Amino acid sequence: MLLGAIEAGGTKFVCATGAENGQVSDRISIPTTTPVETMTAVDDYFTTHPVDAIGIGSFGPIGVNPHDPKYGYITTTPKPGWGDFDFLGHLKSQFNIPLYWTTDVNEAAYGESMIGIAKDVPNSIYMTIGTGVGAGVISQNHIFNGRTHTELGHMRLNRLPGDDFKSNCPYHDICLEGLAAGPAVGKRTGKAGKDIPVDDPVWPIITDYIAQACVNLTVAFAPDKIILNGGVMNQRQLFPMIREKFAAYLNGYEEVPPLDDYIVPAGLGNNSGIAGGLLLAQAALKNA
């Protein structure tokens, strides 16, 4: 049995084949240009690398409710040309195999939950903080969706005194993505993340907002583990700062696991999404 995975990002698509244990046997990276160009390359890949099922995680917003007429679509994305694109419908027209459709962060969350750092617990949250902020919630080893998928990067926070930075989010003045995602860090400092010193005064601000978000996730979902990934979180010195501020904000109200095991980096690194896609392909095949 050979399984397929698609990690569809706003900059690039990663397509891969692999096994039911999430191990990748082959992969390719495709630039995200137009739907016609990018999807033609996706079709070509899986035509020359035939698989039994494909797990797809896409940038969004997307339609994830099977009862929604827009199920399978990329909906209101600002990505030029991709708004109202029937992603799942296109793949169904090309491949007569089981398909699993979800968000890119849900895909990564599932990978970490099944074979990554959260494999020993049933409830976890995976949050990526990079170009944007997105999060996937795993509840009792299943992906959590409500009316639609979560948009936890846009949770409202308390602005720090003296922080007069204009939010980078066009919709919200004090959301996590607007204040602490990679572009916000860049605008605050005028530097690329890799060029910002570990002792730069921006990091206490960024870690405070991430800690606030982790408290919100804790009281809302009661996870066993919060996994932080993405370009901003490549700065490993941020984790102790986040844990310290998290403990201060939670203030002993709720018992949580030891913080070194509770707020953690991804176990699969940049492979979380593709591994999750392979595992979701396996689930789609079993449910077919």
From Swiss-Prot:
Q: Which reaction does it catalyse?
A: D-fructose + ATP = D-fructose 6-phosphate + ADP + H(+)
Keyword flag Nucleotide-binding? yes
Which residues take part in binding ATP? 131, 183, 231-235
Query: What keywords are annotated for this sequence in UniProt?
Result: ATP-binding, Carbohydrate metabolism, Kinase, Magnesium, Metal-binding, Nucleotide-binding, Transferase, Zinc
Q: What is its EC number?
A: 2.7.1.4
User: Superkingdom of this entry's organism?
Assistant: Bacteria
Recorded hits in Pfam families, A to Z, give:
ROK (PF00480)
Q: Which family is annotated?
A: Belongs to the ROK (NagC/XylR) family.
What this protein is called in its record is Fructokinase
Tell me what organism the protein belongs to.
Answer: Pediococcus pentosaceus
Classification of source organism? Bacteria, Bacillati, Bacillota, Bacilli, Lactobacillales
